């Protein structure tokens, strides 16, 4: 229970301080979204990597959401991922008021070839081996 509290506290503090220190690099975009990664914050733990992704929307999503930060766990060898935390923001680039949600589903998602997820995860996995 204490570990869970400490983890949530750490993530809360990180989410609200991350914009000041984050170095978001644009990976891809489409009609309504730009997708960024924070390469400086990629963490490795055995065969898994953990990183933050930022989706910045040109037109707001539901409830005036202009950006979403997602903390993602990836198994680079097995080509699968699990989004752990979603942070919904009312301003662009992960700024402004945030609504933080833990992902209740713990199922891994297999990456489809030729998808944006494939590009994002491949980029993060390659970057993790350089650090």
Located regions from the model:
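Bacterial N-terminal signal peptides
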Residues: 8-17
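N-terminal secretory-pathway/extracellular module detecting exported/lumenal segments
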Residues: 20-70, 75-131
């Amino acid at each position: 229970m204490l570990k869970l509290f400490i983890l949530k506290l750490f993530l809360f503090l990180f989410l609200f301080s991350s914009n000041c220190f984050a170095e978001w690099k644009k990976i891809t975009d489409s009609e309504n979204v730009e997708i960024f990664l924070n390469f400086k914050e990629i963490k490795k733990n055995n065969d898994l990597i953990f990183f933050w992704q930022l989706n910045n929307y040109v037109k707001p999503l539901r409830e005036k959401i202009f950006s979403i930060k997602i903390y993602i766990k990836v198994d680079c060898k097995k080509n699968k991922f699990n989004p752990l935390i979603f942070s919904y923001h009312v301003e662009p680039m992960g700024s402004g008021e945030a609504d933080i949600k833990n992902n209740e589903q713990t199922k891994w998602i297999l990456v489809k070839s030729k998808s944006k997820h494939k590009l994002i995860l491949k980029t993060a996995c390659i970057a993790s081996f350089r650090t």
